[in-house]
Curated annotation (Swiss-Prot):
InterPro entries: 4Fe4S_Fe-S-bd (IPR017896), 4Fe4S_Fe_S_CS (IPR017900), PSI_iron-sulfur_center (IPR050157), PSI_PsaC (IPR017491). This is Photosystem I iron-sulfur center. The eukaryotic PSI reaction center is composed of at least 11 subunits. One of its GO terms (cellular component) is photosystem I. [4Fe-4S] cluster 1 binds at residues 11, 14, 17, 58. Keywords: 4Fe-4S, Chloroplast, Electron transport, Iron, Iron-sulfur, Membrane, Metal-binding, Oxidoreductase, Photosynthesis, Photosystem I, Plastid, Repeat, Thylakoid, Transport. GO terms for biological process: photosynthetic electron transport in photosystem I. It comes from Arabis hirsuta. Binds 2 [4Fe-4S] clusters. Cluster 2 is most probably the spectroscopically characterized electron acceptor FA and cluster 1 is most probably FB. SUPFAM superfamilies: 4Fe-4S ferredoxins. Its cofactor is [4Fe-4S] cluster.
Length: 81
């Protein structure tokens, strides 16, 4: 079951989330929007197991990376039965 992984532009390019991910869902890509000149990207969301280690590792006050579990996404969209 894949989950939705959202990277926000508050990312500071620290790579903590990438290193914390046990399934290599995240990677860093070039980006001029922060001092580190890179941002996290989630090209392999189908491999996300929903452990949320990336969220726990994020040092920003507003989590720059969020994992939305499939049942959370369904509930938030009002599609739950």
């Amino acid at each position: 079951m894949s989950h939705s992984v959202k990277i926000y532009d508050t990312c500071i390019g620290c790579t903590q989330c990438v290193r914390a991910c046990p399934t290599d869902v995240l990677e860093m890509i070039p980006w001029d929007g922060c001092k580190a000149k890179q941002i996290a990207s989630a090209p392999r969301t189908e491999d996300c197991v929903g452990c949320k280690r990336c969220e726990s590792a994020c040092p920003t006050d507003f989590l720059s990376v969020r994992v939305y579990l499939s049942h959370e996404t369904t509930r938030s969209m009002g599609l739950a039965y």
